[in-house]
């Protein structure tokens, strides 16, 4: 018997079969969940529908989180098709490319507002819209990153957005706790995804994480997906308001091992020159 057998969940923001949302969806499906998916626009619909089909789901809905009317349509569609939900996965983040270049000082008000609206407010609006459909014991999960609390090169305004997102998780956990609904964030280590492709020097970031993380590796999509499934299932019934790291332990590190520093410096300089 799967940990999510008989449960119904909504996956918001899956982009392709390399995305973290896909890894979570696949793990939930393997544990017996019935899934529904959203897509941003017609271009991404062509990617999402095959994923939904692979995971035996006929439920695919359009959702541009910048459009209020889409939330209303989503609510009506889910109520009609599924009746209720046991979990929501929020995997939505965006900042204009120019806001990830240069320094934070150069961030425009427009780029800042866009990053906050799409990456943070969308979680609040999504949860509030679908709250009447959430069953007792339901779970809401969003995706964060270490850049929320530590400086990460080329992350800029997204670091601020992820910090705000994690704060929203804590406040939503309190607001929804009285309804026995849990809210958590999953903070994964670097993984090659469509979103990470927009970050400069990402190959170097991957290698740096691999050689400095306590487990001396980068995490896999399956590992992150299984952690997400845990936070959505009854296995984590006592967990809410948490930021759960799945990064091979990298978040605990200060400096790497002294005996390795020379090799690391040479390796990273070589990687940097290849960019």
From Swiss-Prot:
EC number of the protein: 1.3.1.9
SUPFAM superfamilies associated with the record: NAD(P)-binding Rossmann-fold domains (SSF51735)
GO biological process, one term: fatty acid elongation
Chain positions recorded as NAD(+) binding sites: 13, 19-20, 64-65, 92, 162, 191-195
Keyword check for Ubl conjugation: no
Cited CDD domains: ENR_SDR
Pathway: Lipid metabolism; fatty acid biosynthesis
Active site as annotated: 145, 155
Catalytic activity: a 2,3-saturated acyl-[ACP] + NAD(+) = a (2E)-enoyl-[ACP] + NADH + H(+)
Record Gene3D superfamilies: Enoyl acyl carrier protein reductase, NAD(P)-binding Rossmann-like Domain
Complex and partners: Homotetramer.
Function noted in UniProt: Catalyzes the reduction of a carbon-carbon double bond in an enoyl moiety that is covalently linked to an acyl carrier protein (ACP). Involved in the elongation cycle of fatty acid which are used in the lipid metabolism.
Protein family (similarity comment): Belongs to the short-chain dehydrogenases/reductases (SDR) family. FabI subfamily.
Name listed for the protein in its UniProt record: Enoyl-[acyl-carrier-protein] reductase [NADH] FabI
Species per Swiss-Prot/TrEMBL record: Helicobacter pylori (strain J99 / ATCC 700824) (Campylobacter pylori J99)
Gene name, Swiss-Prot/TrEMBL: fabI
């Amino acid at each position: 018997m799967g940990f999510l057998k008989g449960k119904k969940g909504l996956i918001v923001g899956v982009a392709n079969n390399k995305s973290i949302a896909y890894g979570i969806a696949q793990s939930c499906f393997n544990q017996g969940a019935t899934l529904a998916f959203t897509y941003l626009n017609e271009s991404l619909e062509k990617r999402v529908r095959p994923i939904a089909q692979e995971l035996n789901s006929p439920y695919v809905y359009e959702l541009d989180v910048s459009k209020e009317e889409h939330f209303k349509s989503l609510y009506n569609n889910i109520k009609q098709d599924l009746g209720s939900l046991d979990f929501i996965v929020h995997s939505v983040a965006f900042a204009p490319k120019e806001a990830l270049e240069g320094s934070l000082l150069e961030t425009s008000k427009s780029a800042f507002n866009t990053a906050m609206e799409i990456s943070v407010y969308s979680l609040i609006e999504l949860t509030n819209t679908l709250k009447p459909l959430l069953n007792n014991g339901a779970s809401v999960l969003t995706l964060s990153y270490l850049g929320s609390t530590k400086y990460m090169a080329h992350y800029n305004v997204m670091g601020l957005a992820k910090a705000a997102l994690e704060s929203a998780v804590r406040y939503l956990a309190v607001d929804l706790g009285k309804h026995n609904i849990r809210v958590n964030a999953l903070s994964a280590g670097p993984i090659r995804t469509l979103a990470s492709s927009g970050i400069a020097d990402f190959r170097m970031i991957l290698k740096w994480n691999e050689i400095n993380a306590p487990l001396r590796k980068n995490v896999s999509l399956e590992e992150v997906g299984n952690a997400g499934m845990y936070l959505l299932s009854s296995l984590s019934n006592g967990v809410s308001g948490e930021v759960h790291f799945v990064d091979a332990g990298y978040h605990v590190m200060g400096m790497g091992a002294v005996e390795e520093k020379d090799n690391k410096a040479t390796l990273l300089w070589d990687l940097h020159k290849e960019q």
